Design a protein with these regions (language model features):
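Structural preference for beta-strand elements that scaffold enzyme active sites
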Residues: 16-20, 49-53, 89-91, 108-109, ...
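Active-site-adjacent loop and "lid" segments of alpha/beta metabolic enzymes
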Residues: 65-73, 109-116, 172-176, 200-225, ...
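Catalytic beta/alpha-barrel core
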Residues: 70-71, 85-96, 108-121, 132-143, ...
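Alpha-helix-loop-beta-strand connector modules within alpha/beta enzyme cores
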Residues: 38-41, 45, 65-91, 126-132, ...
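N-terminal amphipathic alpha-helix/helix-capping segment at the start of soluble metabolic enzymes
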Residues: 1-19, 77, 268-272
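Catalytic alpha/beta core domains of metabolic enzymes, predominantly
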Residues: 129-130, 134-236
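Glycine-rich, proline-tolerant flexible connector loops at the mouths of alpha/beta enzymes
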Residues: 23-32, 50-72, 237-246
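Structured C-terminal cap/extension of enzyme domains
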Residues: 10, 223-272
Length: 272
């Protein structure tokens, strides 16, 4: 398997787990930074490479009035400051080709949301920057179909590519994770990430917003790591009940270390 370079972090190629973690969306600077600091400290204690994540804009909220974040310009300023303060790589979603250039000036990983994974101009344009690109598999996509997404990006010559499993639509307002997707997608020779928190989301399950079952996050994450997944994606918060987006499927920061410690132990057994 190919390795991918993200600043001074090398991932894939049979190396140990790496983690992308942070709040769903930038709520305010101080709280977002504080969450990132705690997540970094936890990962450092466990010897896990850490990448900070937070969205500057949640463009696909269930309702018009839902909180979306600070937006592109202000959000990128905050992410640049957090990146400097924590001295870690940062990742965030991009939603349109117009966002690619300014986002690439700040972000170490350009992330393509699941709903947009088939948008050729977006995935090609992101890869063309030369930055690492992480594409989330659509909730409507077979694992094998993600090879086509990778091939679009490979046309640019960029090999710093990753793909993420985040669940598959199973009836209305429900997602399931097919564990076969991990060996299938890893056969494409690029690092594969498991989004452990969005995979327990119940899309639109609360009427004007999504719900979720965070109690299943540890179970699914353990199964994914046992299958040999390369990285893990978590949304974490000091108090998910107060979170302005995706609270029901986010992990409490107080739970994060215990969950991750188990996953590191499993990963060491699997990868020797």
């Amino acid at each position: 398997m190919k390795t991918v370079q993200i600043k001074d972090i090398t991932v894939g190629g049979g190396k140990g787990l790496f983690v992308l973690a942070g709040p769903c969306v930038i709520e305010d600077y101080d709280r977002t930074l504080a969450i990132g600091k705690r997540a970094k400290e936890i990962c450092q204690r466990l010897g896990v490479p850490y990448i900070f994540k937070a969205s500057f804009d949640k463009a696909n909220r269930s309702s018009f009035g839902s909180f979306r974040g600070p937006g592109l310009e202000e959000g990128l300023k905050m992410l640049a400051s957090i990146k400097k303060e924590l001295n870690v790589p940062v990742v965030s979603d991009i939603h349109s080709i117009e966002q690619i250039e300014p986002a690439a000036e700040v972000l170490d990983i350009l992330q393509i949301p699941a709903f947009l994974c088939r948008q050729t101009d977006l995935v090609y344009g992101a890869a063309k920057t030369g930055k690492c690109v992480n594409v989330k598999k659509g909730q409507f996509m077979a694992p094998k179909d993600m090879e086509n997404v990778l091939n679009k990006m490979k046309e640019t010559g960029n090999e710093n590519l990753m793909i993420t499993e985040r669940g598959f639509s199973f009836g209305y307002n429900n997602l399931v994770v097919d564990m076969r997707s991990f060996p299938i997608m890893r056969s494409f020779d690029y690092p594969v990430i498991f989004d452990a928190t969005h995979s327990v989301q119940l899309p639109g399950g609360a009427g004007t917003k999504s719900s979720g079952n965070r109690e299943f996050v540890p179970n699914l994450a353990r199964a994914a790591v046992a299958s040999g997944v390369d990285g893990l994606f978590f949304e974490v918060h000091d108090n998910p009940e107060e979170a302005l987006s995706d609270g029901p499927n986010m992990l409490y920061l107080d739970q994060f270390e215990a969950v991750l410690r188990d996953l590191v132990a499993i990963d060491k057994i699997v990868k020797g």
